[in-house]
């Protein structure tokens, strides 16, 4: 495994920055803070409050890499592995970009994102979510994009972890603790991950709604 962030090295809070719905007038807030486990190993806690009242049911919080001009070449790898130390039952999104943001302004420059949604098992125990690069879907401001180019894994410019409301399907305080984020070599098998039937139904309804052209304020 190629460690991108975290164990066995330390997490660095300055490598990430908040990109929340406040950029669109919302009230949600996110943090990424480094903490130590019982063995003194570094972990990253993604936490905050997802608000859906201000924007009428919509909302999102995210922490994006904040490393100017950094590019990752992962063409010798086949996916991303999230080593999760602790989680709630919310649905999260892991996002990759292969286009640099506009670092000269304080506003986010909209660009194509490649996203994967996952729902960790509610647990204080370690769990792993493995994501093939082929499963990352192109989106623009939360909407699927048909005919978009494939993710160029040879020039990845940004990673993000996000929680969004999925049209008021979830809100409130959240917390996801990560041991590490790693790239998976081509000769290493993937793990599998499932969500409850009820949560799957809610988010399937969300996918149908955005595919039908409903308004979306998600990043």
From Swiss-Prot:
Q: Which residues form a coiled coil?
A: none
Name the GO terms of the biological process aspect. mitochondrion organization; protein-containing complex assembly
Instruction: Provide this UniProt record's keywords sorted from A to Z.
Output: Cytoplasm, Nucleus
Matching Pfam families: CIA30
Q: What GO terms fall under cellular component here?
A: cytosol; mitochondrion; nucleus
UniProt-annotated location(s)? Cytoplasm; Nucleus
Q: Which GO terms describe its molecular function?
A: unfolded protein binding
UniProt keyword Flavoprotein present: no
The text of the family note is:
Belongs to the CIA30 family.
From the Swiss-Prot or TrEMBL record, give the protein name.
Uncharacterized protein C9E9.15
Tell me the lineage of the source organism.
Eukaryota, Fungi, Dikarya, Ascomycota, Taphrinomycotina
């Amino acid at each position: 495994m190629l460690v991108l962030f975290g164990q066995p090295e330390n997490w660095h809070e300055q490598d990430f920055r908040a990109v929340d719905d406040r950029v669109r007038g919302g009230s949600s807030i996110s943090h990424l803070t480094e903490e130590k486990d019982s063995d003194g190993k570094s972990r990253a806690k993604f936490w905050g409050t997802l608000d859906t009242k201000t924007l009428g049911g919509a909302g999102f919080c995210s922490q994006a890499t904040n490393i100017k001009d950094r590019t990752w070449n992962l063409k010798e790898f086949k996916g991303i592995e999230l080593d999760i130390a602790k989680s709630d039952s919310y649905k999260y999104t892991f996002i990759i970009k292969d286009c640099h943001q506009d670092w000269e302004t304080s506003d986010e420059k909209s660009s194509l994102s490649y996203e994967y949604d996952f729902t960790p098992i509610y647990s204080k125990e370690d769990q792993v979510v493995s994501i093939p690069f082929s499963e990352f879907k192109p989106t623009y401001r939360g909407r699927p994009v048909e005919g978009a180019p494939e993710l160029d894994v040879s020039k990845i410019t940004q990673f993000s972890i996000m929680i969004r409301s999925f049209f008021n399907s979830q809100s409130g305080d959240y917390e996801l603790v990560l041991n590490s984020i790693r790239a998976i070599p081509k000769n290493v098998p993937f793990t599998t991950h499932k969500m409850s039937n009820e949560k799957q139904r809610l988010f399937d309804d969300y996918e149908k709604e955005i595919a039908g052209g409903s308004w979306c304020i998600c990043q």
